[in-house]
Amino acid sequence: MASRDSSAASEITPDVLLRAYACGIFPMAESVDDPSLFWVEPDLRGIIPLGGFRVSSRLARTVRSDAFTVTVNRDFKAVIDGCAAPQPGRDDTWINRRIRELYIGLHDIGRCHSVEVWQDGDLAGGLYGVSLGRAFFGESMFHRARDASKVALVHLVARLLAGGYTLLDTQFVTDHLKSFGAIEVPRLRYRSLLDDALEGEASFAALPLDRPVTGTEALAIITRT
């Protein structure tokens, strides 16, 4: 279900955005050139049950090797710009200028976070999402090197588990996310999970923010669940 915002996009503020997330809806744009936004509340919502997160043996080896350096909130703007750029199999983007401004605003008040994956000093991939209560809403991810976005997701899940999160919302489910254990839940079930997650508070800083977390550390947290 979607409803287009017919008012000026500038009327949507970071505070309005957070209240929308608390109601189970999120904004999108038709394309990068479309200044309007529309609200989305899928009949079937994508989530990754944190206790059922799956990491393949091959990916675990990559994560453990620390071929990439993983940081948090080091370059949020570069991550959202990477997510907005064309990717293989995806020529267009729903991240328009207003979306970018809104999520940078959420980042500035500590409600939106990025995970960066670096290779030889260059940004190889990453993801960003919104934190509210014990829920994390994954917005988008990208990669410029093989497995970079997958490594970002592994490190994100480790951080969420360490911080006491109970809900990882992926909005939709793709074959890529299914490989990590993503499932679809009906809207009413999702609302129940969201309401429960909003009753408490989690910490995105439960793992260090000032130094990279190693792959071995991240996998140890995941395998304890």
Swiss-Prot record:
Keywords: Acyltransferase, Cytoplasm, Transferase. One of its GO terms (molecular function) is leucyl-tRNA--protein transferase activity. InterPro entries: Acyl_CoA_acyltransferase, Leu/Phe-tRNA_Trfase, Leu/Phe-tRNA_Trfase_C. It is found in: Cytoplasm. It is an enzyme of class 2 (transferase). Its EC number is 2.3.2.6. Pfam families: Leu_Phe_trans. Coiled coil: none annotated. SUPFAM superfamilies: Acyl-CoA N-acyltransferases (Nat). It comes from the Bacteria. One of its GO terms (biological process) is protein catabolic process. This is Leucyl/phenylalanyl-tRNA--protein transferase. It comes from Rhodopseudomonas palustris (strain ATCC BAA-98 / CGA009).
